[in-house]
Amino acid sequence: MAMQKIFAREILDSRGNPTVEVDLHTAKGRFRAAVPSGASTGIYEALELRDGDKGRYLGKGVLKAVENINNTLGPALLQKKLSVVDQEKVDKFMIELDGTENKSKFGANAILGVSLAVCKAGAAEKGVPLYRHIADLAGNPDLILPVPAFNVINGGSHAGNKLAMQEFMILPVGASSFKEAMRIGAEVYHHLKGVIKAKYGKDATNVGDEGGFAPNILENNEALELLKTAIQAAGYPDKVVIGMDVAASEFYRNGKYDLDFKSPDDPARHITGEKLGELYKSFIKNYPVVSIEDPFDQDDWATWTSFLSGVNIQIVGDDLTVTNPKRIAQAVEKKACNCLLLKVNQIGSVTESIQACKLAQSNGWGVMVSHRSGETEDTFIADLVVGLCTGQIKTGAPCRSERLAKYNQLMRIEEALGDKAIFAGRKFRNPKAK
C-alpha cells in the first residue's frame, strides 16, 4: 500500500527541546512517530540535525530537519510509490538519497522520523500489531516480554548532583511476568524515595530527566547502598538485581577518569582505567550488580578488553558501539563487551536498528533496548523490544509520563498475548535460550 501524504512538524521533547514528529497517511489512516534525543551522546552517533539559530530555542530548533522531510524526503518517497510494508526498501532509499556516512545531509532525526512512521503504517497494512510486524522484519517467530531496567538514581550528565556515574538501575528478574516486574519496580522505587527522604531530606527526592532521584551524594557506592536498602525494605532481595550505566566518556580526562568531574578540576584525583576497573569489581562483590554499561571511555579499547576478561557479568556498550554495525564488529573482534545498547536514533533507521541487533545476537551478545533522556510520548521501543526478543529494556524510572508510556504499552502487549506471553526473567541476557 502506497503512502498518500507525509508531513513533519516540530514538537517538544520531555526536556523542553524541539524534536521531529512525522505524520504519514495511507488508505488505512494516519500514523504518527516522534524522535527522541540524548544528553550524553557518543561521538560516533548518526547526526541529529539542529538549526543552530541561537535566537530560537537556544539553537536547538529542528526546522531544517522538518523542511528536509516536507520538501525533499517526503515528496521523493511519494513519487517512488514504495509500499509501507517494504521497510528495508524505504530505509535504503532514504539512506541512499542522503548519501552521507552519518546521515548529516537530511539529519538522522528526519530519516528516523519517517522510518518509524513507515513501520507503524506497515503493521496496520498487514493488519497485525506493531510488535508482530517488527518480529517479522527481524525473522523472529517468537515474542518475548523484557525485564525492565528502572533508572531510579540519576547522576552524571542527567543530574545536578556530584555523582559521576549516570544511572543506577533495578531489574526485577525474579518476577513471573512483566506486570509483576512493574509492580516490584514501583514498590522498590517508593521505598527508595522514603529511604532518601529520611537520610537527606525532602528536597533530595526531586527527580532527574528520566524520573530517578538525584540526591546530592558524591560516592558511587553510596547510591548502591541506597538501592540495597530500598530493595530489602520492599522485601525483594531475592527478586531484584542492580544495573549501572557509568557513561565514563563523560568524565574521561587525558587518559584518566575523574570521579569528581562536577567539581573544580584536580588532576591529582584522576584515576587510571585499571583502578576504575577494581572499583567496579568491588561493586560486583558487595552488591547484586549484574550489568555495567559504558564502564570506560568510548576509545579506551584496551581497558574494556582487559576488564571483560576478568568478570562474568553483562558489560554493555553504548557510547562504545552507538548501535553502529562497524563499531559493533570492532567490539566483537576486540572482545570489549558482551551486550549492545540499542538506540534507534543513534543509527537513524528501523532497518539498521534491526541489523545491529541481529549482528550483536549472532555473536552471542545480549541486547538491551533503550530510550533517550529527551523522550516523547511515542511508544515505538516497547513494541520493538518485544519483536526483537532482546529480553531487556531501559526506559527510565516508573515515573514521568514519557517513561511510563513505554512501560504501560508493554503491559498492554503482555495482556494482548495472554497465555502466549513469555517473560524473559532471569534469562534476560539470552532470552531465546531454551
From Swiss-Prot:
Protein name per its UniProtKB record: Beta-enolase
PANTHER family given in the database record: BETA-ENOLASE (PTHR11902:SF5), ENOLASE (PTHR11902)
Cofactor(s), names only, from the UniProt record: Mg(2+)
Gene name of this polypeptide: ENO3
Source organism (scientific name): Homo sapiens (Human)
Catalytic reaction annotation: (2R)-2-phosphoglycerate = phosphoenolpyruvate + H2O
Entry's family note: Belongs to the enolase family.
Taxonomic placement: Eukaryota, Metazoa, Chordata, Craniata, Vertebrata
EC number of the protein: 4.2.1.11
Positions carrying Phosphotyrosine: 236
Residue sites binding Mg(2+) per the record: 245, 293, 318
Noted disease: Glycogen storage disease 13: A metabolic disorder that results in exercise-induced myalgias, generalized muscle weakness and fatigability. It is characterized by increased serum creatine kinase and decreased enolase 3 activity. Dramatically reduced protein levels with focal sarcoplasmic accumulation of glycogen-beta particles are detected on ultrastructural analysis.
Free-text comment on the cofactor: Mg(2+) is required for catalysis and for stabilizing the dimer.
Compartments, record wording: Cytoplasm
